Amino acid sequence: MSGYTGNNYSRYSSTPPRQRGGYHHARRSRGGAGGSYYRGGNASYGARYNSDYEQPPQEGDLRQTGAYYRNGYTDTRPYYSANSRHYQAQPSPRYNNGTNSYHLPQRGNSQDTNGRTTSASQEDNDEKRVKSRYRNMQADHPRQQPMSVGSTSSRNGSSGNSSTSSTSNGLPPPPSVSSITNNRSYHSSAYPYSSSHTYNNYHHRETPPPPPSNGYYAKGYPVHVPENRSNSDGSSSSVVKKKRILDMKDSPFIYLTDFDKNVKKTNNTESECEKAREVFKESDSIDSALEELNLKINSNELELRLLNNQCDKHALNIQLTQEKLDSLLLMQ
């Protein structure tokens, strides 16, 4: 970060350290020794950085933390692990010497950070330079709102000259779509989100697959029984009932054995069916007689068990009386 605004917060956060989970910096320097922990004093900051803590944000200078933190960018913190160190926002000469600075694309001649004049022919060279870390701020944070107009102020360089911005609110034009998609952001591997990350995919649900067809289920009956329909003649529209050869009062064995279907349709069909009826009637009578005999056998078996139990009871009574007699004989 090039500007030291005095908030003494971490590099990417606008929230004070005491409000971020109770985290405290190891050594927080105040007053004229601002930045002495990491750099070693106020002397190396240059003419622009003095002990004034409330410097106004420089016009068009996106490297200043105050320009973002004082205008609505309240959640620019990337993901930090639990034990990672939060370094203070310290200015460094590699962000001040102009090699890594963000130059405003202007039509006419203007002065950059160090007072050098740049013309319109140098715009291509400016694009080829190393992009600042906040060049793709909108790509890293697509939900953030643009900065307000109130952040514009006069910019005093080291030579005392002032430069005016090409836009009304003192900000450069937003990066193009090609620069967002083609250029890799500064947080290439450390930042958890990609440059084209959107935040509505949390509740994203894929469409369920279509239900399987009826032929998918090999076992079981289909839901709709297929009907064979032929539109060749009009008589097929009416349901044709198949007339059974045998009546329902006949023996069920006829239908279980499909005897009525196996009978050949000849002139003596009725005689064959009559013979089959007589045979099945005889078999039914025989089955009923067998059932009666089976019932008699079961009843006789129960009677035998009862008699056996009675015999056991009588045997116990005889043994008891014999013991009583023996006891009486011993007493005499």
Swiss-Prot record:
Q: Which GO terms describe its molecular function?
A: molecular condensate scaffold activity
Could you tell me where the Polar residues compositional bias lies? 1-17, 81-122
Q: Provide ranges: composition bias, Low complexity.
A: 39-49, 148-170, 185-199
Which regions form coiled coils?
Answer: 284-328
Keywords assigned: Activator, Chromatin regulator, Coiled coil, Methylation, Nucleus, Transcription, Transcription regulation
Pfam families from the xrefs?
Answer: Lge1 (PF11488)
Spell out the Basic residues composition-biased ranges.
Answer: 21-30
The cross-references to InterPro entries, in alphabetical order and at most eight, read: Tscrpt_reg_Lge1 (IPR021581)
Which portions of the sequence form the region Disordered?
A: 1-240
The cysteines covalently paired via disulfide bonds are none
Q: Where are the transmembrane segments?
A: none
Of the GO CC terms on this record, one is: nucleus
Q: Which BP terms does GO give this entry?
A: chromatin organization; premeiotic DNA replication; regulation of cell size
The modified positions for Omega-N-methylarginine read: 30, 39
Q: Where in the cell is it found?
A: Nucleus
Function field: Required to activate transcription of PDR3, a gene involved in retrograde regulation of multidrug resistance, a phenomenon that takes place in cells that have lost their mitochondrial genome. Also required for ubiquitination of histone H2B to form H2BK123ub1. H2BK123ub1 gives a specific tag for epigenetic transcriptional activation, telomeric silencing, and is also a prerequisite for H3K4me and H3K79me formation. Its precise role in H2BK123ub1 formation however is unclear and is independent of retrograde regulation of multidrug resistance function.
> Extra info from the record?
Present with 2060 molecules/cell in log phase SD medium.
Describe its partners and assembly state. Answer: Probably interacts with BRE1.
What name appears for this protein in its UniProt entry?
Transcriptional regulatory protein LGE1
